[in-house]
Amino acid sequence: MYLLRRALQAAEEAIKGSEANKYQLWNTEEYPTVWGTEASEANPGEILFEIVNTTTESPGNESMGYLTSPKGYQDMCITVSFYHHLLETPNDVRIKLLVNQDKKVMYLNKYQPQPGENIMDANIPIVRLSETYLNAAEAAVKNGDATKAAKYLKAIALRGNPDYTMPAKVTLDDVLEERRKEL
């Protein structure tokens, strides 16, 4: 129980510290288009930590952007079952991150290059504020704090799908389901 309380406390401290430094969750309108945009001091977005990847530092043909892009190797695609799962909630904004090449294979379009660069120069998001919210929701569920679990889950679920209906009581399965869609 001690570790669960500490996990929730750590997640909440990370959220408060991030938001105090102007990091914020992307809103529903921003979410599909913000990948690959440059953060600024005034608007750092929700990526808390990312690996900067340019062809100067690494061979671009092995970058996440190149591996996951239909314009690259096309090595990483989503499963058919995950695609059909996302289609069950057609108003979920995260569906807009999917790109298809030939209607047979779907790619996740999260590894975008910075403006003016090519797909080989896509940075790799490691930790996002949304993941921290989901960590807090999971720790709250495991700690029996239904109010905090609902608070953190709601922020991510409604951002992803404005038609989302919050369950009467948030369960671990609810949090894991949202994590599956978000990350």
Task: Label every model-predicted segment.
Residues 1-64, 74-77, 87-183:
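Acidic/polar-rich alpha-helix caps and helix-coil junctions
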